[in-house]
């Protein structure tokens, strides 16, 4: 008699938090890079910007930077893309 292997269903997206995203950015690239969501031709893109919080010429205060990251994170969570973004931030070769 053959054994039936259980099917592993994908886990629902656990929401991202601003703190988690900032921690991933710092761990991955050793800097708190800014993020932006961009819509082009009906598609959404998450961009890691060249500017980062620790840079002397960074135009935002730390509080404003964190608010901006939280805005991006809320949008990503609302689209149900938390796991995809989490995985991309951790594994991207860019």
Residue map of PLM features:
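N-terminal organelle-targeting presequences
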Residues: 1-94
């Amino acid at each position: 008699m053959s054994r039936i292997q259980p099917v592993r269903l994908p886990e629902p997206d656990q929401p991202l938090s601003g703190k988690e995203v900032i921690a991933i950015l710092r761990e991955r690239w050793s800097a708190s890079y800014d993020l932006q969501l961009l819509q082009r031709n009906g598609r959404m893109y998450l961009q890691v910007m060249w500017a980062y919080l620790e840079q002397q010429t960074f135009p935002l205060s730390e509080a404003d930077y964190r608010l901006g990251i939280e805005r991006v994170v809320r949008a990503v969570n609302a689209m149900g893309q938390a796991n995809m973004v989490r995985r991309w931030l951790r594994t991207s070769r860019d």
